[in-house]
Amino acid sequence: MKKVLVAIMAMFCSMSSFAQYSSGGFSLDEENIYWGVRFGMTAASLSGDLDASSKVGMTLAGVVGLRPSDNTPVFIESGLYYTERGGKNGGPYVGLKRTPDGSVSRVGYNILEIPLTIKYGLKVSDQIAVLPFFGPYFSYAISGKTKQTVKGTTESESVGTFDEKKACHGGLNRASMGLKLGVGAEYNKIYLELGYQFGITNIAKEENFSGRSNAFFANIGVNL
């Protein structure tokens, strides 16, 4: 117990010391709110019965961060993200209602996403800060298209990813949520981040099926 208390005290002391550092033009000692923009890419996939491998997409976002306490370099960040999601080489669930044998489906859809992440600032040097983060995200798909091609031919057909009448098993649910974790690095207001998003809600509409959307992501941007 004594060692645990000492470790906790050391952690709080180190947190207080981090509060004085500055990363480039961003000073934790002076600024409690920051704004930023992000641009990057995702490698998204669908798991479960959807079973679709990685599909590369684009991300655009505007973010805002708040430091709730002057004593610790902890930030709460949110924003609005536009992200391309989906997967390719999907199983029979993600195709059309009448899926030919040997067909390949490429699922694509675009989402608006609102994350709510907690970041902790770690000083690397006077110019560089590292910020691990985690938190939930909430998303809603605004559009989507699924393209199905029969292997060995040029024959293909497209359908709306969320089309209950034409998409296999009623298509996908538009709303979803999950967990987001990763690490960011800031240098002179330039910000880089890498991470992974785990879908925790079932996006398959039919009750007897399950599926989740997951994605690796890499973004670059600036914090102002």
Predicted segment positions?
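Glycine- and aromatic-enriched membrane insertion/assembly motifs of diderm outer-membrane
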Residues: 34-36, 42-45, 51-104, 110-112, ...
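Outer-membrane beta-barrel biogenesis signature
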Residues: 5-8, 16-33
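Outer-membrane beta-barrel translocator domains and adjoining extracellular loop/strand segments
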Residues: 47-53, 88-95, 144-153, 204-209
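Transmembrane beta-strand segments that form the barrel wall of outer-membrane beta-barrel proteins
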Residues: 37-47, 198-200, 204-205
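Outer-membrane beta-barrel transmembrane domain signature
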Residues: 68-74, 104-191, 195-203, 224
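Outer-membrane beta-barrel "beta-signal"
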Residues: 189, 212-224
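Membrane-embedded beta-strands of outer-membrane beta-barrel proteins
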Residues: 37, 60-62, 80, 114-118, ...
